[in-house]
Amino acid sequence: MSNINVIDILKESDALLEGHFLLSSGRHSNRYCQCAKLLQCPQKAEKVISVIAEKLKEVDFNIIVGPAMGGVIVSYELARQTNKPGIFAERKEEVMCIRRGFEIKKGDKVIISEDVVTTGKSSLEVAKVIEEMGGEVVGIACIVDRRAEDIKTNYPIYSACKLEIETYEKDNCELCKKNIPFVKPGSREQK
């Protein structure tokens, strides 16, 4: 499985885009990764997620939790490939929680699944819920790790690929200076 070129599959799926983007963080970028475009193609998603499943072979875990929306399909496919249960967390009144009869039992060893990890905010919210329920987070699995060097987590990251995507403050954005209009493709509501 190591001969899979994840970047090529992301590009073929139109999941890795070039242009001028306003990110959910408020920063601007010339590249954007929209893994939903990959996840709409089950055969391609299966290949990419197999790269993560391979990395998890030596990790001791018994359940996968994906935050809605981006982590739901990743959780399902990763659970299928690792033969572990896969569930999801979702927001209720803006607070991340485990619902729908899903549960984390005391002592469960949990992998959090994501499509893209940028700041780790969603993963950390899910980790807090898991730990409050008595579970232990043993790692974060994602298709794309696009964290900047200064973004650290307390958990190991198991990704299909690492992308370094430059971001800029609006005032320092060369694309804005060239009057190139931006697209706001993000999934998190900006306030």
Swiss-Prot record:
| Endpoints of the signal sequence | none
| Catalytic reaction equation(s) | orotidine 5'-phosphate + diphosphate = orotate + 5-phospho-alpha-D-ribose 1-diphosphate
The source organism is Clostridium botulinum (strain Kyoto / Type A2)
Function per UniProt: Catalyzes the transfer of a ribosyl phosphate group from 5-phosphoribose 1-diphosphate to orotate, leading to the formation of orotidine monophosphate (OMP).
Q: In which residues is orotate bound?
A: T118, R146
| Spans through the membrane | none
What CDD domains does the annotation carry? PRTases_typeI
Please give the family membership noted in the entry. Answer: Belongs to the purine/pyrimidine phosphoribosyltransferase family. PyrE subfamily.
Q: In which pathway does it act?
A: Pyrimidine metabolism; UMP biosynthesis via de novo pathway; UMP from orotate: step 1/2
Q: Does the keyword Transferase apply?
A: yes
Protein name (database record) = Orotate phosphoribosyltransferase
Q: Which Gene3D superfamilies match?
A: 3.40.50.2020
Cofactors that this protein relies on: Mg(2+)
Per the record, the gene is pyrE
Residues annotated to bind 5-phospho-alpha-D-ribose 1-diphosphate? E114, D115, V116, V117, T118, T119, G120, K121, S122
Q: What is its EC number?
A: 2.4.2.10
For whether the record's keyword set contains Glycosyltransferase, the answer is: yes
SUBUNIT field: Homodimer.
Give the molecular function GO annotations: magnesium ion binding; orotate phosphoribosyltransferase activity
Q: Which GO terms describe its biological process?
A: 'de novo' UMP biosynthetic process; pyrimidine nucleobase biosynthetic process
Alphabetical keyword list: Glycosyltransferase, Magnesium, Pyrimidine biosynthesis, Transferase
List the SUPFAM superfamilies hit by this protein, alphabetically: PRTase-like
